[in-house]
């Protein structure tokens, strides 16, 4: 496909569910249908095809999502991320309480120079967006493919400083 648009179900499934066992390269720990749908959307795109999905933001840094991030951000590249400040105003007519983002991804091996990150308070104030253009390597970083959702220049500067550290806290003996 040239384009895929999705609002997949947000639902954890058992590790031994057929959907999870069919995709062991992306499923680890506690699989969720939304990232299985997103993986299949990306898989079914033609080269340079685009997808837009509204999904929870938990995949951006959660340990259970590492395999998904590795697949998703190797086969595709983030071009735009939209953040909602409110957890309960995205699906205001439903009882969904979820930190939700909209992502635009292109199926390509070519890494873009930047990612656009926009944010709004709810699903009804897209006319009042804040917008930030951030270097791709600052947003998607590390061997775990973490996605850093910065919203202003101060956060960008903090992230630049953090990326200069070459060791993790556990690597220097700090335990939590």
Regions found by a protein language model. Give the residues of each.
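Signature of N6-adenine DNA methyltransferases within the class I
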Residues: 1-176
